[in-house]
A protein has these predicted regions:
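Active-site- and interface-proximal helix/loop "cap" or "latch" segments in soluble metabolic
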Residues: 23-83, 93-94
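Aromatic-enriched hydrophobic runs in primary sequence
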Residues: 2-3, 11-13, 55, 59-64, ...
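Generic preference for hydrophobic/aromatic residues in regular secondary structure cores
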Residues: 4, 17-19, 63, 99-106
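C-terminal charged interaction modules
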Residues: 80-107
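Basic/polar, acidic-poor N-terminal "presequence/leader" segments
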Residues: 1-30
Length: 107
């Protein structure tokens, strides 16, 4: 099982994503979130086909297709976190922390 926690920026919402290999080609997803928009996405996004999500263009993934429908703004980082959890659970990439850090001017 792979689990990630996301705290979004300005909206201050939190989401926990649990990815668990359900068979050789699929990962099951479970979400706990404070965001009503991500909850709507989670209600539909129960399982992902690993090969399909990793082989199509970004906007053709099931994650971003549903994000386009439910997420409140384009800069939401939760869809990227879902794909990261999928990659780790499928043993495509090792788990590694990701960050977005805003720097002060001149740094």
């Amino acid at each position: 099982m792979s689990q990630v926690w996301v705290k979004a920026g300005q909206c201050n919402q939190e989401t926990s994503i649990e990815a668990r290999r359900s068979d050789m080609t699929h990962v099951a997803l479970e979400f706990v979130t404070t965001c009503e928009h991500i909850q709507k996405l989670a209600d539909e996004l129960k399982s992902l086909d690993i090969a399909r999500e990793m082989s199509v263009k970004l906007l053709e993934t099931e994650v971003y297709r549903l994000a386009n429908e439910y997420v409140c703004r384009n800069s939401c980082i939760v869809p990227a976190a879902i794909l990261k959890a999928l990659e780790v659970e499928a043993n495509i990439f090792p788990a590694a922390e990701s960050q977005i850090v805003f720097l002060e001017p001149g740094n």
